[in-house]
């Protein structure tokens, strides 16, 4: 199982490959706001752990194992953003909040959050009812 730091790298590499067709060390460093030397060290570790194949100066490719985890990590991130929007978290807080919680939830918790998001999306009246509760609670403060 990858560490939270490894997950951040795998997720970002997956996103870059999906968007651009490739992921370079410099692109990863820029996206994660870290030094290229840190990226190189982590990429070597991810290569050793078979999440990707890295050839110096030639780039990297996610293995099937890395792709599968990358997809799941992107899903988790997007689901948590969706959930926080659904429950009315201010837009300017969402990214930071997701980054703060995503590594601390079990996959079981993520799946249950997915169920809850689906529950609300299946009937707009449920979302309206939640908004009404939130308005009442805010007025009561």
UniProtKB/Swiss-Prot annotation:
Protein task: Central regulator of manganese homeostasis.
High-level lineage: Bacteria, Bacillati, Bacillota, Bacilli, Bacillales
Cell location: Cytoplasm
Sequence positions that bind Mn(2+) 2: 11, 77, 99, 102
Protein name: HTH-type transcriptional regulator MntR
Family: Belongs to the DtxR/MntR family.
Pfam families with a match to the protein in the record: Fe_dep_repr_C (PF02742), Fe_dep_repress (PF01325)
Family matches, as HAMAP family: HTH_MntR
Entry keywords, A to Z: Activator, Cytoplasm, DNA-binding, Manganese, Metal-binding, Repressor, Transcription, Transcription regulation
